[in-house]
Amino acid sequence: MAFDPIQEDCHRLVLEALRRDNIPLTDGPSVERLMEQFTRNPAPLIVHDRDRAGHLIAKVVEAVDYRIPFIPDDTQAEQEEAAAENMLREAAALDPANWDAQRMLTALTAESNEEYVQYLVSKCDEVEHDLALKIASAQDPYEREAAGDLIRRPYLRWLAALASRALISGRYRMSLEAANRSLDFAPNDPAGVRHTAMLAMAKLEYPAEELRRFRSAHSVPYLANTPLRRRPKDAERDLDPWTLIALMSAAWRELDYEGAEHYLRILVRSCPHAAEALYFQTEFPDGVYARVNVGVGSTDELVLALSEAAPVLSLI
């Protein structure tokens, strides 16, 4: 459901090393050796400025998305955030075409969410055009391998950030349009924008039937995380929390209080400590790189969904 910056850094550096030494992509032992090198010490794999820029981003993500939000000491957190910002500035200078670096730096330095949204909107077509050029210009097997997945991800993260931040700013139609744009480009939805789309549709007061049609139209990523079930009622238990919240909101608006209570009961039973999470609705830190990694069906996933769904829940 989310992107792994360390895994991407490893993939990128290993692919570049194979290319430099003209090692076939099918050479399993060499790939394994390079991956072990990355785990031990990635420094020998970092040759070009773009390599270092990508590696810096992975380090920044570890800090700003997974460590700093949970540091209790404000002074230490501010120091680490300043260090992360400096690393992003270095990454952006080393590789001006690295859209992750540009976007994350703006996310950290923008004066407001609205300013960040405007930046994302203003550059979105440029990011898409740059990606199209990279895909079209891929010549060797290594470039084509990257073009099939790796170099597409910054664009998907861009659209996911736009969808998420537009939702926060109350621009629900813009949020839904960005999510649909991402789903059209990548139907497997590695960015998880379908969840943001569900919340935007709830705020736009789509009826419950429209929400179900949306899930059906984008069934591939939903099925990837859903166990096979024989009975429809059993399948309801596997609905993700974003869908359950959106359906609960739709039922409430339609004065279907029994239906709203039904989805609430499923939420309460969805994971350990669900009732506590629903009661406190703790704010979950918004990922700067992308939606943070949480386990499917976990309490953390529910807390994350509740945090993102704050605009929806405020009206229930």
Show the residue positions of the predicted features.
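Extreme N-terminal leader/anchor segments
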Residues: 1-94, 102, 261-267
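Amphipathic alpha-helical repeat scaffolds of TPR domains
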Residues: 12-19, 48-71, 95-112, 149-165, ...
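Flexible helix-coil transition and linker loops at the boundaries of alpha-helical arrays
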Residues: 42-50, 88-97, 125-152, 182-186, ...
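Long, ordered, amphipathic alpha-helical scaffolds
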Residues: 45-46, 60, 226-316
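Structural motif corresponding to the intra-repeat A-B loop/turn of tetratricopeptide repeats
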Residues: 66, 78, 111-114, 169, ...
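Short, charge-rich amphipathic alpha-helical segments embedded
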Residues: 75-115, 181-198, 269-277
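Alpha-helical repeat scaffolds
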Residues: 80-89, 116-131, 172-181, 206-224, ...
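Glycine- and acidic-residue-rich phosphate-binding/metal-coordinating active-site segment common to enzymes
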Residues: 181-240, 246
